[in-house]
Structure formats: C-alpha cells, structure tokens
Amino acid sequence: MLGSYEFEALYAIYAKGARTQRAVAAASGLSLGTANATIKALRAFGLVDDSLAPTDAALDALAPFKVDNAVIMAAGLSSRFAPISYEKPKGVLRVRGEVLIERQIRQLREAGIDDITVVVGYKKEEFFYLEDLFGVRIVINHEYATRNNNSTIRCVQHLLGNTYICSSDDYFTENPFEPYVFRAYYSATFASGPTEEWCLVTKGKERLISGVEVGGRDSWIMLGHVYWDRAFSQAFGRILDAEYDDPACAPRLWEEIYAAHIDELPMVMHPYEDGVIWEFDSLADLQEFDSDFIDNVDSAIMDHVCRMLGCARSDIHGIVPLKQGLTNLSFAFEVKGRRYAYRHPGVGSDAFIRRSAEVAAESIAYELGLDRSFIFEDVTDGWKLSRFIAAREPFDGRNVAHVDAAMAAARTLHASGAVVERSADPLKDAESYLEALSADRRISFRDF
C-alpha cells in the first residue's frame, strides 16, 4: 500500500503528466527534496521507469484510491434561503448563467466520476430531469421533513465506499474533484476574525482533524464537499446503524455524529484558497456573489411583494425567515425603511384553512381596527402580506391585562354584526383535522 508521499508523487506522474522531479514537486505539493526521494522509492517499487513514465503496476498501486462515486445531497428545504427556497430548491437555481447542481455534476464528470447519485426530498420533482440529462441516479429521502441530513446518508449507505459527499447548492470556481484521493477529508477555508461556522482543530503535518468547535476566531472552517474513503464509510455506517433509531439522532447533522465519534473516524482537513468554494446561506450571500441574480430569478413571491408595495426587487432587504408557523412558511423583510411579513402557504395547509373565510375575517378585523397589520391575502393561493409588528411579549392566558385586552377585541368583533360565510363548529372541525392527520400518519402519541 502506498504511503501519502508515494501516492501524491505517483498521482502527479500518472494523472497530471509530471515527467521531471520539479514537475512532480510542483504538481504534488511535496518539497523538491521529498519529491526526489519519493521518486527513487517509486522506481524501486517498479511503479515508474527511468523517464518517470508510469508502469503497468502503477495503475494497480493506485486502484485502492480510485473514487467510486459521488452523492449529492439535495433533500432539504434550506429555510434560511427565504423566500426563494419556498418556491424551488437551491440546487436548481441559476447562478452566473449555470444551474448549481448541473455545474457540479459536470465538474464531477470532468474528473472521471460518472456514478453520481442525487438524494432528493423537498420539491423532489424539480430534480427528476437530471436522470435524462446526465444519467444520474435519483434516490428519494422520504424522511427529509422529520430528520436532518443523517437521513440522506442513510438512504445511500449501501452505495458508500470511496465517495464524494456534496451539497447541491455549492459553487466551485475551480474544479475540486479528482479521480484518485488518498484518504478521507473535509474541505475547509480560512475565516479571518470571528465566525459562527464550524471550526476545525487539526494536528500534525497531515492536518488530521482532532476536534470541531462551533464558532471561533481566525480559524479554518468546514466548507464545501467531503470525501469518504472506504474505511470511513464503513465505520460511519456502523455508528449510524447503532444510533439511527434513537430519537435524539433525528435532528442531528451527519457532521454532528462525526464530531461525536471523531476518534473513530479519522479524516484530514483539505485546505482551499479563499474564493474557490462558495456556499449561499441566504439570499444576501448569493446577491453578493451574483449581483444579477435577484433581477433574473423566476420568483412569484418577489413579484407579489413588488406589485403590492410598488417597489423594485432591489428595494427588498433584510430578509429573515420566521419560524412561528405550524404549516406555513413566512419571512420578514424591509422595503424603503418599513418592515413587512410575507406568508407563503405550506404544503397541506389548504386541508385546514378555508381561504375565503380567512380573507373575509382578516378584512373585517382590519376595518374594525383590530388588526392594522393586514395588507392583502390572495384568496386562491393563500399568500398574505402584512406590516411587521414586533411582539413586545407573547400572550399569556394567566395575565389579567392580556386577557382583558383580548376579550375587549372579541367584544368589538361580535358587537359589530359582521358575518362571514363559515360558521364555527369545534367538534366537526376537530374531526376533520383528525381525519387529515390520520391520513398522513402524523399522530404518533400512544395516549392521543
């Protein structure tokens, strides 16, 4: 089995065409002295001839390090990327003229990696065309809404060997993929100053990862793709088998599982220069990278906001996802110094809400002065635009002042004589909700 120096030198000769000692040093990153000594060893092993051409035995020596395949994770919602991710997955967005996931697939194929699996979940149909366009394998993660990305790993666990693990929304300015890799690694870039990202602690010349800390300063941070060698894949699979059914495992990133078992899962840090790897956690991040994106992206949500507020897309700033909704997706934003909130109807919300009655009730509450935040709701599609009001404190049923204010509003509403088409029948409504929940198998409490 080749050591790291032998691998780097032989790979430079075999795959990069290096034919002089200086070329080997430059292509492998080894010092000239180390390259010279390593070349002598390769000759002694019969892996290169006197002209530094690889022999037939070189391919056999490199075989254990050949990349088997790649997995692209594309199942998640990416809620921080509101509002664009409410309409389509980040991976299918067009950035600087290319669809993100398509660019990544092309880069993998340019490196000779043709066995590519895309794991989908949220808006999965958006990715199905990739089967015909690129011949990739599509795997559906049916647990994407209830578990973190460890469920994506579970879906492809049987495929993992010497495998690249990628995210569909990464953008690489240079192709980072190679057909042969020596050992498992996590790509990283250096963050100057304070950072809230996952910071790596390494040891030794090979930069073996010995610790992971969330947040730090002037540190190498986890960013971009990962490579798992066969030993790592097998070890991680055993750990995932043991922990997967534990409810505490469901919300964990696979990286959290790795960090908890770091001594059992050797992996090195692969440093990249600043500007090679891009991840877009928010719309603002992407706008910084591609200034034309916001004007070119196909977004009904942005069009709704612009039409209702009489603004341009460039006027929309400070987008912050709101997590209070049970079924809907909402975000707050700012236009010309004023804050607003937009509600995007979630999947299945129509089963619980009659939009026509909701619009009528909202309009009455606005006219009576009970809700001055309301601006507009679309009775067909269910999206709603409101003025954003920051809550000073949440309603507390044990607070007499809170209850008095709520009941005063209720008396105003009932005394108004206003009528909507829908009558309230708590028992009938509860039965219909129960039927909808049962159909989706969402009731999991034994004593319900």
Descriptions of predicted regions:
Residues 53-86:
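N-terminal nucleotide-binding beta1-loop-alpha1 segment
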Residues 276, 287-320:
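Juxta-kinase regulatory segment immediately upstream of eukaryotic protein kinase catalytic domains
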Residues 8, 20, 173-249:
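Conserved core of the sugar-phosphate nucleotidyltransferase
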Residues 1-28:
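Short amphipathic alpha-helical interface segments
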Residues 43-52:
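A short, conserved structural fragment
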Residues 284, 290, 408, 424-448:
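Active-site catalytic-loop/activation-segment of kinase and kinase-like phosphoryl-transfer enzymes
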Residues 125-202:
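Conserved beta-loop-beta/alpha segment of the NTase-like Rossmann-fold superfamily
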Residues 320-425, 446:
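ATP-binding pocket architecture of kinase catalytic cores
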